């Protein structure tokens, strides 16, 4: 029996409503002033997504996001579930740009399913969300080897590999940090997805990183961070210390940016309201 990730009633209702709101969604889904699309990392709405995947996707489309990036749990979807989600994305006029994956998904045993689901969803990048294997320079070189090996299989299927940083990858001296090791030891086709907030918290300069790796920052997690007590990542876009104007300039003039992704780990507002406010602030800052 086909396993369903969402109820048939919810899917049918969402799909039925979508065509009537299509023009409104397109009007809301405006690109950045540069023409670069703005999406959302679905971890930002993780609680809503777990309860109602289809309804949550419709809400982020209604908010004006042009696309999205699914994270970890997507890997458990069957091909049929992925096809249902792709139909909804098409109905709403938005894209799945990429997915976040556990490092284990890049193994020879698991990469096949990742390829199948990502091809159905219509994405481009299969991103390693983090790695627990890296602890020494040699260990990080091994992570690079895994990415290179997986990228060959992904590229044969019309997909690309990527790596997403957290704090650990940007700690240490410039030139010997884990991210430096990954950048030097992965193929140029492996995307270096920059998480701005964690880079800053780790004490590194995200603008300098972009400039040091031209053409490889194809997507960027626009996550804010504040050093103020009890704030951290619980701030909206623009309420922290990230130098967004300089980041946009570097990303769009040499960085190789193809799409922006807003990510927020929690705030004083609901998940959906947070997503709406962050997108509005992004547009006000970027000039869209």
Describe these PLM feature segments.
Residues 25-51, 59:
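C-terminal segment of N-terminal export signals and the immediately downstream linker at the start
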Residues 40, 60, 68, 89, ...:
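Conserved, mostly hydrophobic/aromatic
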């Amino acid at each position: 029996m086909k396993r369903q990730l969402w109820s048939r009633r919810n899917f049918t209702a969402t799909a039925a409503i979508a065509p009537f709101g299509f023009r409104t969604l397109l009007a809301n889904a405006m690109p950045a002033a540069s023409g670069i699309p703005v999406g959302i990392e679905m971890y930002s709405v993780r609680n809503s997504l777990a309860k109602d995947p289809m309804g949550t996707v419709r809400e982020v489309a209604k908010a004006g996001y042009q696309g999205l990036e699914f994270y970890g749990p997507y890997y458990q979807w069957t091909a049929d579930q992925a096809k249902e989600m792709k139909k909804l994305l098409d109905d709403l006029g938005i894209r799945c740009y990429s997915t976040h994956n556990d490092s284990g998904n890049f193994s020879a045993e698991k990469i096949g399913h990742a390829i199948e689901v990502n091809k159905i969803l219509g994405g481009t990048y299969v991103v390693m969300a983090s790695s627990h294997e890296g602890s020494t320079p040699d260990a990080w070189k091994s992570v690079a080897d895994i990415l290179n090996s997986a990228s060959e299989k992904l590229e044969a299927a019309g997909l690309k590999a990527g790596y997403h940083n957290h704090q650990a990858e940007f700690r240490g001296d410039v030139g010997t940090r884990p991210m430096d090791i990954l950048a030097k030891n992965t193929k140029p086709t492996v995307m270096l997805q920059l998480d701005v907030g964690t880079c800053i918290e780790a004490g590194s300069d995200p603008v300098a990183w972009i400039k040091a790796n031209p053409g490889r920052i194809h997507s960027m997690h626009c996550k804010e961070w504040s050093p103020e007590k009890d704030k951290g990542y619980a701030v909206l876009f623009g309420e922290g210390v990230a130098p967004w104007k300089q980041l946009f300039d570097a990303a769009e003039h040499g960085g190789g940016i193809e799409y922006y992704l807003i990510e927020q780990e929690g705030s004083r507002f609901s998940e959906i309201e947070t997503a709406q406010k962050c997108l509005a602030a992004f547009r006000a800052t970027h000039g869209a």
